[in-house]
Amino acid sequence: MNLVSLQNSLDNATFAILLPTLLCYWTGVAFPNLKGLPAIGTAGMAIANLCMAALLGARWLEAGYFPISNLYESLFFLAWGLTAIHLLAEKLSGSRLVGAATSPLALGIVAFAAFTLPKEMRQAEPLVPALKSNWLMMHVSVMMVSYAALLVGSLLSVAFLVVTRGQAIELRGSSVGTGSFRQVKLNRASDLTIATAESGGSGGTAVLEQPVLQLAPEQLSLADTLDNVSYRVIGLGFPLLTIGIIAGAVWANEAWGSYWSWDPKETWALITWLVFAAYLHARITRGWQGRRPAILATVGFGVVWVCYLGVNLLGKGLHSYGWFF
């Protein structure tokens, strides 16, 4: 079997593995008494991750360069990163809901790359002179892994909003750094709560009134875990995004003589950085937990997709892959 046929077999195999994996996770969420399904789903994600690693390795051998230079390659690299980050997040959370959230995204990316892209966009081509640089691996791979981490973290925030139905809840665990400690007490006589927020060392007290959703202990524990793991995964993706942007600026200066040219991709990378910087700032310095940072991360989910795929398909700028519809 030649390398091209091997790649075709591996991308089809990845799709064939991820589809039943998704069904396992969703069935496990719908029927919690079926205890073995999450383990099958985890195994499916791990096997899919290995298939994509083998596909990228075969592509590297065929083309002679790190396989991340076109849309097909970057989509599979992103899906590989998603499945890897998923395995980390699932280990941290121990929840089958992680797979129920991330497996559809991984499956959709693989299906788009394997079955939607035109054949000419799936073929390896010689690198243009500007891409014949070690910065290709440094910049693009770090950016793609950061996208994967930010997407998984944002999806966990979406899952948090689903579990809590978008309502304010009491979170007893702490997933913040130096932020204020907040304790919420439920007023049994009404649907309102009086929340007392004490800032460390300031002596100030703020009294707030807002409805708080009452959850079963299992749901409350799950929501707290999703909030915590989402924060940690986004905390992993943000420094990688920062490193990737800096590496891209250095590469741009070497290739075109300018660190920053306000290319659409550069602009949206900056917007993405600002959104998640605001998220981390709110959590670390303001002590945000629960609904508000989850909403901000959900916005970030859309921003990442615009940054990665939206501006690339417009056919404009130095990062364009070209529109194909």
Curated annotation (Swiss-Prot):
One of the GO biological process terms: cytochrome complex assembly
Main subcellular location: membrane
GO cellular component, one term: plasma membrane-derived thylakoid membrane
InterPro entries from the UniProt entry: Cyt_c_assembly, Cyt_c_biogenesis_CcsA, Cyt_c_biogenesis_CcsA/CcmC
GO MF term (any one): heme binding
PANTHER family per record: CYTOCHROME B_B6 PROTEIN-RELATED, HEME EXPORTER PROTEIN C
Record NCBIfam families: cytochr_II_ccsB
Protein name: Cytochrome c biogenesis protein CcsA
Organism per entry: Synechococcus elongatus (strain ATCC 33912 / PCC 7942 / FACHB-805)
Lineage: Bacteria, Bacillati, Cyanobacteriota, Cyanophyceae, Synechococcales
Gene that produces this protein: ccsA
